[in-house]
Amino acid sequence: MNIMDFNVKKLAADAGTFLSRAVQFTEEKLGQAEKTELDAHLENLLSKAECTKIWTEKIMKQTEVLLQPNPNARIEEFVYEKLDRKAPSRINNPELLGQYMIDAGTEFGPGTAYGNALIKCGETQKRIGTADRELIQTSALNFLTPLRNFIEGDYKTIAKERKLLQNKRLDLDAAKTRLKKAKAAETRASSEQELRITQSEFDRQAEITRLLLEGISSTHAHHLRCLNDFVEAQMTYYAQCYQYMLDLQKQLGSFPSNYHSNNNQTAVAPVPSASSNVIGSSALTSTSSLVITSPSNLTDLKECGGSRRARVLYDYDAANSTELSLLADEVITVFSVVGMDSDWLMGERGNQKGRVPITYLELLN
């Protein structure tokens, strides 16, 4: 019974306090009551905290978009995070593109120029995908998590104490208003006592709020370190991607010029019409030696009709008796043969001789 009486009294007191604050707030808005202003330093701290919160949220959300452009994937990760479960690993776009390229290159044949180039590009894309995954993980841990901790932790505490300060300020101003309206000596003494209590509570809450807000400078310093970590992660990522692409470019650039087309006969200048089959056949034969027009080592080799030394890039198993099996890093002699497919050269090792795919070779000076 006593507990029930206590709860009723507390409920009535809380309702009275809430009503008093509502009246004071309304009268302030209508200009019918005075409002205690916070000191300039505290106001500046509150403004700084609010500004920090707004921009931190914007930076955090846009960084998430940068690292994961797919909104559905971001929603999925958010749900798993709220469920305190690890999101399933998913293949990213560079990895998917790389796998498609590798599959296509395998389908076209690694012994063809285009197929071999696709495989190399695919492997590079998959390495870029791995670097992208590492960037996301590092950035989430060292940059996004500290920003989110501030929004969901420190700033929520600041907002809670700020709201409490606002309530204490309303209580103080309501007490001041009641003191002004008090006429009887007994009522005035009670109002003065209430004013002293509310003033003390307001000052105490203002000090608590000020101490919390002064921690924003430390937050900025911490976020600066996190920003440096993010920049370093990006620098590492872009440096890796640049190196991967540079290596790929060198590999593709080391290919003979006819790597750029598996069917470079389509680039041959059209054969003029002839008055006889003999002339047409002669014209076709003469143009067969002009299919490679860019000045490259392979062009020189074919034009001079001589032989060159070549280093084998990869192991190659001969498909039939007309081909020559190769071992990576061995050096063989190669030369062109009139009428041979543009993707092949004739290779010679000792007394062994056979066709070899040019995609497996690097011509030596």
Swiss-Prot record:
Chain positions with N-acetylmethionine modification: 1
Region described as Membrane-binding amphipathic helix: 1-30
Coiled-coil spans in chain: 155-195
Superkingdom field: Eukaryota
Membrane topology: Peripheral membrane protein
SMART domains attached to this UniProt entry: BAR, SH3
Cellular component aspect of the GO annotation: autophagosome membrane; cytoplasmic vesicle; Golgi membrane; membrane; midbody; mitochondrial outer membrane
Function: May be required for normal outer mitochondrial membrane dynamics. Required for coatomer-mediated retrograde transport in certain cells. May recruit other proteins to membranes with high curvature. May promote membrane fusion. Involved in activation of caspase-dependent apoptosis by promoting BAX/BAK1 activation. Involved in caspase-independent apoptosis during nutrition starvation and involved in the regulation of autophagy. Activates lipid kinase activity of PIK3C3 during autophagy probably by associating with the PI3K complex II (PI3KC3-C2).
Name of the protein in its database record: Endophilin-B1
Protein species of origin: Bos taurus
